[in-house]
Swiss-Prot record:
Native organism: Shewanella woodyi (strain ATCC 51908 / MS32)
Entry keywords, A to Z: DNA damage, DNA repair, DNA-binding, Glycosidase, Hydrolase, Lyase, Metal-binding, Multifunctional enzyme, Zinc, Zinc-finger
Biological role: Involved in base excision repair of DNA damaged by oxidation or by mutagenic agents. Acts as a DNA glycosylase that recognizes and removes damaged bases. Has a preference for oxidized purines, such as 7,8-dihydro-8-oxoguanine (8-oxoG). Has AP (apurinic/apyrimidinic) lyase activity and introduces nicks in the DNA strand. Cleaves the DNA backbone by beta-delta elimination to generate a single-strand break at the site of the removed base with both 3'- and 5'-phosphates.
Residues at the catalytic site: P2 (schiff-base intermediate with dna), E3 (proton donor), K57 (proton donor), R260 (proton donor)
Protein's UniProt keywords contain Thylakoid: no
Protein name: Formamidopyrimidine-DNA glycosylase
Length: 271
């Protein structure tokens, strides 16, 4: 599943082709995504794209008339192609530009989304209650300490809660907790400030490194040019249950937390 780094890599890849371009057409071949593509999505046609930014895992394409909201879901990707590029089986949506380029949305599992919103985008129900971005100053140890006070839920589940902080999905939550030496099942409210300082730092560093490396390639993700990411080569725990810990050699344990695979080292990560 594309997480924050993958969506940010996609944004960086498509932005130069979209900004200041007039939209000349929107072709919807299959409207049956996670939510049906609304007819209102056609309102972007004739508009000039002013900016392309990201909020959590949502890609936001801004015009004067409104914003197209794109979510990659479990297996979605965006590529910039030409009019001569053959349409493939799961190419559900084309956004055509005056330059002759096309922003093409491919989603084999159809858990992604393509929506339209005319009001200020922060008011959209999908975005209005989101927590801070992890790579901004708003996500800091003091904020996290206050947010976790009294919480008995496992720290890993809190780290993946978009109301607390956005975009820290399963891959990066596993990796950050390993780097910080924190057991994923530890009660969130019992993690002291000293450990939270380390955890916040590791979250920021791991996400920034993943973006720099072009995202993590696990099954479906490719960037806007169709190339894979390379951060998977640097994973210490995710997907490595039963293998040796890269720090101590102990066998890594794998459990389910919130129905998600959770891998950790019982020696290096403590409660």
């Amino acid at each position: 599943m594309p997480e924050l780094p993958e969506v940010e890599v996609t944004r960086q890849g498509v932005s130069p082709y979209l900004i200041d371009q007039e939209v000349t057409g929107l072709t919807v071949r299959n409207a049956s995504l996670r939510w049906p593509v609304p007819d209102l999505a056609q309102q972007i046609v004739g508009q000039t794209i002013r900016s392309v930014h990201r909020r959590a895992k949502y890609l936001l394409i801004d015009t004067d008339a409104g914003t197209t909201i794109v979510h990659l879901g479990m297996s979605g990707s965006l590529r910039v192609v030409t009019e001569l590029t053959p349409v493939e089986k799961h190419d559900h949506i084309d956004l055509s530009l005056a330059s002759g380029k096309i922003l093409r949305f491919n989603d084999p599992r159809r858990f992604g989304a393509w929506l339209w919103y005319e009001l200020p985008i922060d008011a959209h129900p999908l975005l209005s209650k989101l927590g801070p971005e992890p790579l901004t100053d708003a996500f800091n140890p003091s904020y996290l300490f206050e947010s976790l006070k009294g919480k008995k839920k496992a720290i890993k589940l809190c780290l993946m809660d978009n109301h607390i902080v956005v975009g820290v999905g399963n891959i990066y939550a596993n990796e950050a907790l390993f780097a910080a030496g924190i057991h994923p099942q530890m009660e969130a409210g019992k993690v002291d400030q000293e450990r939270l300082i380390i955890l916040v730092s590791e979250v920021k560093q791991i996400l920034a490194n993943a973006i720099k490396q072009g995202g993590t390639t696990l099954k479906d993700f490719t960037n806007a040019e169709g190339k894979p990411g390379y951060f998977a080569q640097k994973l210490h725990v995710y997907g490595r249950g039963g293998e040796s810990c890269t720090q101590c050699g102990n066998l890594l344990s794998e459990i389910k937390l919130g129905q998600r695979a959770t891998v950790f080292c019982g020696l290096c990560q403590t409660r």
